[in-house]
From Swiss-Prot:
GO cellular-component term (any): extracellular region
Family classification: Belongs to the frog skin active peptide (FSAP) family. Dermaseptin subfamily.
InterPro entries the UniProt entry points to: Dermaseptin_dom
Role description: Antimicrobial peptide active against the Gram-negative bacterium E.coli (MIC=8 uM) but inactive against the Gram-positive bacterium S.aureus. Also inhibits growth of zoospores of the chytrid fungus B.dendrobatidis at high concentrations (above 25 uM). Shows anticancer activities since it is cytolytic against HepG2 human hepatoma-derived cells (LC(50)=45 uM). Is only weakly hemolytic on human erythrocytes.
GO biological process, one term: defense response to bacterium
A Pfam family it matches: DD_K
Record's subcellular location: Secreted
UniProt entry keywords in alphabetical sequence: Amphibian defense peptide, Antibiotic, Antimicrobial, Secreted
Coarse class of the protein's main subcellular location: secreted
Name by which UniProt lists this protein: Dermaseptin-L1
Annotated organism of origin: Agalychnis lemur (Lemur leaf frog)
Tissues where this protein is expressed: Expressed by the skin glands.
Length: 32
């Protein structure tokens, strides 16, 4: 249903945000 689609979208958005934050932290910790 619609609610499950919303939950899936929220889960995907949260994962993407977490990956983005992790990437920024990794860049800060490991200057190239």
């Amino acid at each position: 249903g619609l609610w499950s689609k919303i939950k899936e979208a929220a889960k995907a958005a949260g994962k993407a945000a977490l990956n983005a934050v992790t990437g920024l932290v990794n860049q800060g910790d490991q200057p190239s």
